[in-house]
Amino acid sequence: MASSSSNRQFSHRNANTFLTYPKCPENPEIACQMIWELVVRWIPKYILCAREAHKDGSLHLHALLQTEKPVRISDSRFFDINGFHPNIQSAKSVNRVRDYILKEPLAVFERGTFIPRKSPFLGKSDSEVKEKKPSKDEIMRDIISHSTSKEEYLSMIQKELPFDWSTKLQYFEYSANKLFPEIQEEFTNPHPPSSPDLLCNESINDWLQPNIFQSSDERSRKQSLYIVGPTRTGKSTWARSLGVHNYWQNNVDWSSYNEDAIYNIVDDIPFKFCPCWKQLVGCQRDFIVNPKYGKKKKVQKKSKPTIILANSDEDWMKEMTPGQLEYFEANCIIYIMSPGEKWYSPPELPPTEAVHSDRS
C-alpha cells in the first residue's frame, strides 16, 4: 500500500494465461466453457482445465488458456467463475505449465489445439541442461507460477530456499498476501441493532446521519464521536452494530485494516497507547502507519469517522495537554454519559396479573 508496486492498478496482458482457482470443486468441463466464453473477443485457441486435490482433501482447479490475440484486462475479477476467484499469471513457459497441470489431475478437460513453445535450452545436450543450476530468480519465478495458495507458496520456498525462508520469512509472508489476497466475504453484522436509552438521543442521531448513514462528497471530512461512561452499559455493542468497521481493543493493529469499512472503533485503549490518534480522531486521509510485523503502508483513502469508547477511569481528555484537547474538541462530538443511561432499550416488563385477569 505504501510501496509503489502495491499502488499499481492490476493489469494482465498475455496470449498465454495460467489460472489457479484455490478451493474450487468446479467441474473442469464447465469451467473450460465458461472461461472460453469470457475471452471470445481475443479468439481462444486452446484451453486445458484440471482438478486436483490438496493434501487436506480440498479441491483446486488449474487452467491454461491460449488465445490468438493477447488477453488484456485490468479487472482482477475478470476470470471469476461462480464466485471462485483465481490467481492470474502469465504462462511464460506453456510447455512446463501444461506438464505441471497434468502431473496428478483428478479430472481433465481440453478444448482446441495446444500451441507449444520452443524450449529455452534448444540446441543444448541433456548433460548441459542438467549441469545448469537454476538461479534464485528462476526458482522464485517457478514457485510463483505454480503455487496455488499462501500455504503452498511458503512451503515451496521453505523447501527450495531454506536459508532465505529462515531469514526473510516476513517478506515472503508479505508477498504471499499480495499473490493470494483474502477475498472479502459479504458482511453479516453479528451485533443486533439497539436503541440507546439516553437523555439526549438527538445529539447522537445528529452525528449518525452525516457520518455513518449518509454518503457524502469524497472531499468532505467526517467527524468522530467520543463516548465516556461506566462499563456494562452497551457502548461497544451499540457501536459495532452500525455497519462494517475496523475494531481495535487493547491495541491498534494496522495489519488487518479494512479500507472498505465505513468507520473505525477504538475500544478501551488508553490515550497514551493509541498511535496516530490525531489521524483517527481527525478523520484524515492517506496517512502512513507502521504495522508491528509488516512494512509501512498508507491507509484510509477516504475520510472515516472513529468512535472512541472509554470508561470514566481512563477518560482521554484527562490525559491531554491543552493543545491536544483543543484539537480533540474541534474534531469530535463528545458524549459524557449520565447516571442510568444505557446504549440499549430496557427490557419490556412482563404483563401483570391484573392484565391477565382483565383479558380473561
Swiss-Prot record:
Organism the protein comes from: Maize streak virus genotype A (isolate Kenya)
Active-site residues, Swiss-Prot/TrEMBL: 100 (for dna cleavage activity)
UniProtKB keywords: ATP-binding, Covalent protein-DNA linkage, DNA replication, DNA-binding, Endonuclease, Helicase, Host nucleus, Hydrolase, Metal-binding, Multifunctional enzyme, Nuclease, Nucleotide-binding, Nucleotidyltransferase, Repressor, Transferase
Binding residue positions for a divalent metal cation: 52, 60, 62, 104
Protein name: Replication-associated protein
Cofactor: Mg(2+); Mn(2+)
Subunit note: Homooligomer. Rep binds to repeated DNA motifs (iterons). Forms the O-complex, which is a Rep-DNA complex involved in the initiation of RCR. Part of the C- and V-complexes which are RepA-Rep-DNA complexes involved in the c-sense and v-sense transcription.
Cofactor annotation comment: Divalent metal cations, possibly Mg(2+) or Mn(2+).
Entry coiled-coil feature ranges: none
Comment, domains: There are 3 rolling circle replication (RCR) motifs. RCR-2 is probably involved in metal coordination. RCR-3 is required for phosphodiester bond cleavage for initiation of RCR.
Pfam families: Gemini_AL1 (PF00799), Gemini_AL1_M (PF08283)
GO molecular function: ATP binding; DNA binding; endodeoxyribonuclease activity, producing 5'-phosphomonoesters; helicase activity; metal ion binding; nucleotidyltransferase activity; structural molecule activity
Residues that, per the record, bind ATP: 229-236
Motif (Nuclear localization signal): 292-303
All residue ranges annotated as the CRESS-DNA virus Rep endonuclease domain in the record: 11-114
Example GO BP: DNA replication
Domain of life from the UniProt record: Viruses
Residue window of motif RCR-1: 18-21
Subcellular location: Host nucleus
Record carries keyword ATP-binding: yes
GO CC terms in record: host cell nucleus
Assigned EC number: 2.7.7.-, 3.1.21.-
Motif (RCR-2): 60-62
Family: Belongs to the geminiviridae Rep protein family.
